[in-house]
From Swiss-Prot:
Belongs to the universal ribosomal protein uS11 family. It comes from Marinomonas sp. (strain MWYL1). Signal peptide: none annotated. It comes from the Bacteria. This is Small ribosomal subunit protein uS11. InterPro entries: Ribosomal_uS11, Ribosomal_uS11_bac-type, Ribosomal_uS11_CS, Ribosomal_uS11_sf. GO terms for cellular component: ribonucleoprotein complex; ribosome.
Length: 130
């Protein structure tokens, strides 16, 4: 009699990362939060648009807070405890995303603004007339 087929698959080992980097990209329209390890390998990410906010609600501080909470909770499953925060962009979700990461219990070591500043590069968009 033949044996029932069994698969020889190994259980995937979940890596544990204690120190990481939280990249917050806050544009005027959306906020993207990516949490990586020190080498830059992504552990988790979330956006304000992917968190259920659409249209003008996507560009609010509350939407950035929800996105940071979603990315942070997934990263904590990897054992993340300490983060360095890199903030890029002029958007409204800059500060609330950092506050949300702090409220999750992640220890924030330092906060760095890495917004690219042109040395007279491209012409900026025209001013809004409302």
């Amino acid at each position: 009699m033949a044996k029932p087929a069994t698969r020889n698959t190994k259980k995937k080992v979940k890596k544990t990362v204690v120190d990481g980097v939280a990249h917050v990209h806050a544009s005027f329209n959306n906020t993207i939060v990516t949490i990586t390890d020190r080498q830059g390998n992504a552990l988790s990410w979330a956006t304000a648009g992917g968190s259920g906010f659409r249209g003008s609600r996507k560009s609010t501080p509350f939407a950035a807070q929800v996105a940071a909470e979603r990315a942070g909770t997934v990263a904590q499953e990897f054992g993340l405890k300490n983060v360095d925060v890199m903030i890029k962009g002029p958007g409204p979700g800059r500060e609330s995303a950092v506050r949300a990461l702090n409220a999750l219990g992640l220890r924030i070591n330092n906060i760095t603004d890495v917004t690219p500043i042109p040395h007279n590069g491209c012409r900026p968009p025209k001013k809004r007339r409302v």
